[in-house]
A protein has these predicted regions:
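Intrinsic disorder at enzyme termini
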Residues: 476-568
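Helix-rich, typically C-terminal accessory recognition domains appended to large enzymatic cores
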Residues: 121, 344-380, 397-505, 626
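A glycine-rich helix N-cap at a beta->alpha junction
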Residues: 78-92
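Structured secondary-structure scaffolds
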Residues: 2-49, 101-105, 155-370, 417-421
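Short secondary-structure capping/junction motifs at helix and strand boundaries
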Residues: 88-96, 114-127, 139-140, 154-157, ...
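Cys/His-rich short segments
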Residues: 116-169, 173
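Phosphate-backbone binding interfaces of nucleic-acid-interacting proteins
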Residues: 548-669
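N-terminal catalytic cores of NTP/NDP-binding nucleotidyl/phosphoryl-transfer enzymes
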Residues: 2-76, 95-111, 115, 132, ...
Length: 669
């Protein structure tokens, strides 16, 4: 087949904090099916994936495990690469952000952007989410928590370098409007435009000083380069980009990328930050960024503590690699989230793979052996007008499917493409019911018609298997082997009758997919859930013990104040208060106003803890209150006491609460 040119495809690189679950692996399987399909179409495909290995979260994970960050990422990167191999992923490059050539290029990119004025030095003060490694302003928080993951954020203030995002915002808006295919699906484009670009971009923090596990800034080594500027550039460093203008021929051939395939949760970074970085470097933008939906577990996000995390290796061990590939590709809608449970995988395996496909192949080969010793000949005989009609309809369905599949794949509607392919197998099964080979076999005069029917079935199956290859490569090869033929190139799939007449199929057909006992499936799932919950509980206990040991080892010295007399202390009245309601003080960035029940009274107390607690988190807490503090107005709001807090060396505040449950109003003495 004549080459159609290059096709450069990437996935988001996997974060090496922990072993990924099947929801994470979905993306790499989706990308692999696209890469394989494009290769069969005649494109010169380069498929890159890899691992994102820097950041504070990894540093903390390694510290908790008592190993170095490099040891941690080496281990997890090995696990991720092993899962790629297990899932039969045909990547061309596996990049790691700890690769020496990548790190050097990131440093050169940072220096170049700094030298040309796109990066400047400043100071950052805001709310930081460690799991997402993202800074947020208070206005961006949702109920006081990270808008991306819903996790706890902490105030952070540090010297940092910033990228001038607003400088390129108008250019990016123009590009998006002029290239409607750039962000897909369209709903993701609308989200980026309305929520981020049109309201105005803020400058982006691109370095950190509060941790060390990252790529140092060459001219200011106490700073490490922020994860997104590090991770995103893998798409160009992995194919030979050089910030000094000495990029490789491979880079010149492959860039711009034809497709960045990513999860919908990181589309902002890939459709705003990344294209702006490229504009600053004077490089073309990727042709398309596709934000795929999530694969949920039983309708909810996967959680180890709930015991509902599903790992690819467990699924493959039980169902087989192609059954897993088929399920995650077939069950993921174009925009909405998909759903996975062991029961659903088993049901789909039984209905589509064991019955529709496996039974069809087995019956066809078995009948060929039974009636003709395995020899398949094209007699091209129709005995009746109806024979001609059903043969023509079968051939039209089989040869017309390729164009439909190509159209679906052009839109990245992979699930729909698979549905079209299985339409061939369903039509073949219907053809068996229409032609009734077992009836034809009873009449020797109809032997040539019987041979024609079996030939048509074999021809339909091999065309379907050839289309199926990008999605289920092992299964497609097994089918071709049993039919004693080869999988076909795509330019042959609109022709019917290329199977060599007189070929002999295997005399021992194998079961492609065995039917599964649903009771056994449920038992296996329950065993894994129980083991996971137990492991999660043990892990939480270990973390709690580690935190306790760490707390015992930590101590803070503060500057002592002047001594006071006991009588001075005795003047202060401390009581337990219960917060019954709380709200933010208007026009204040720091203050919360709480209604606090103390005995039979309710007092209004204003506290500067908005950066540490949301109003919702405050309600219901038992706190220690200085009751007889003289009332005062804070930001125009009357405060009738003081809620006590502890403060660590980093300025983090924690409410002081009684160790045991005490009634509101109990005296603290």
């Amino acid at each position: 087949m004549e080459s159609k040119g290059k096709y450069y495809l990437t996935t988001a690189i996997a974060y090496t904090s922990a072993k990924p679950h099947i929801g994470n692996n979905y993306e790499i399987v989706l990308a692999d099916s696209i890469a394989r399909f494009k290769r069969k179409e005649g494109y010169d495909v380069f498929f890159q994936t890899g691992t994102d290995e820097h950041g504070q979260k990894i540093e903390l994970k390694a510290e908790a495990a008592g190993i170095t960050p490099k040891e941690h990422v080496d281990k997890i990167a090995g696990v991720i690469r092993g899962l790629c191999d297990l899932l039969n992923i045909s990547y061309d490059k596996f990049i790691r952000t700890t690769d020496e050539d990548h790190e050097k290029q990131v440093q050169k990119i940072f220096k170049r952007l700094y030298d040309q004025g796109d990066i400047y030095k400043g100071a950052y003060e805001g709310m930081y989410c460690t799991p997402c490694e993202s800074f947020w302003t208070e206005s961006q928080l949702v109920d006081g928590k990270c808008p991306d993951c819903g996790g706890v954020v902490k105030p952070a203030k540090e010297e940092a370098y910033f990228f001038r995002m607003s400088k390129y915002a108008d250019r990016l808006i123009k590009h998006i409007n002029e290239h409607p295919e750039f962000i897909q699906p369209v709903s993701r484009k609308n989200e980026m435009m309305n929520n981020f670009l049109l309201p105005g971009l803020q400058d982006l923090c691109v370095s950190r000083t509060s941790f060390t596990w990252g790529i140092p800034v060459t001219f200011d080594p106490k700073h490490v380069i922020y994860v997104w500027l590090d991770a995103l550039t893998n798409y160009i460093t992995g194919i030979g980009y050089d910030a000094d203008g000495n990029s490789t021929e491979q880079y010149k051939k492959l860039w711009p990328a034809d497709l960045h395939l990513i999860g919908k949760d990181i589309i902002r970074f890939h459709t705003i930050y990344w294209p702006i970085f490229l504009m600053a470097l004077g490089e073309p933008l990727p042709k398309q960024v596709f934000g795929h939906p999530w694969l949920l577990m039983g309708g909810g996000k996967m959680s180890k503590s709930k015991g509902n995390v599903v790992y690819a290796d467990d699924l493959v061990d039980y169902f087989g690699v192609d059954a897993v590939r088929y399920y995650v590709l077939h069950e993921m809608p174009f925009e909405n989230d998909g759903n996975l449970t062991w029961e659903l995988v088993a049901e789909r395996t039984n209905s589509d793979l064991a019955n529709t496909l496996g039974n069809l192949v087995n019956r066809t080969i078995s009948m060929s052996n039974k009636y003709f010793g395995g020899v398949v000949e094209n007699k091209n005989v129709q005995l009746t007008e109806n024979d001609a009609v059903v043969d023509a309809d079968l051939k039209q369905t089989v040869t017309g499917t390729y164009a439909k599949v190509v159209a679906k794949m052009e839109e990245l509607r992979v699930a729909d493409a698979l549905t079209e392919i299985f339409g061939i197998f369903k039509r073949c099964n219907k053809y068996i019911d229409e032609t009734e080979p077992w009836v034809l076999a009873k009449d020797e005069a109809k032997a040539d018609r019987l041979a024609t029917v079996l030939y048509n079935l074999v021809e339909g199956i091999i065309i379907g298997a050839s289309l199926l290859e990008p999605y289920m490569p092992e299964t497609a090869e097994r089918i071709a082997k049993q039919l004693n033929t080869s999988l076909r190139d795509f330019d042959q799939l609109e022709q019917f009758g290329l199977y060599e007449s007189g070929s002999k199929v295997t005399d021992q057909p194998e079961i492609l997919f065995a039917r599964l006992d649903m009771k056994d499936v449920a038992k296996k799932e329950a065993e894994l859930e129980e083991a996971m919950i137990k492991a999660a509980a043990e892990h939480e206990a270990e973390e709690a013990n580690a935190e306790a040991e760490k707390a015992e080892q930590e101590a803070i010295d503060i500057e002592p104040k002047a001594e006071i007399e006991y009588d001075d202390f005795a003047k202060m009245q401390f009581q337990v208060g219960e917060i019954i309601s709380c709200e933010a003080v208007p026009k204040s960035k720091k203050l919360l106003c709480s209604q606090v029940k103390i005995g039979s009274q309710v007092r209004q107390i204003v506290s500067g803890i908005k950066a540490h607690y949301s109003p919702e988190e405050m309600v219901g807490k038992k706190v220690m209150v200085l009751v007889n503090l003289k009332p005062a107005k804070l930001a125009g709001v009357l405060s009738e006491g003081m809620i006590l807090c502890a403060e660590d060396a980093e300025g983090n505040l924690a409410l002081v609460t009684p160790e045991k449950n005490m009634p509101a109003g109990a005296e603290i003495c």
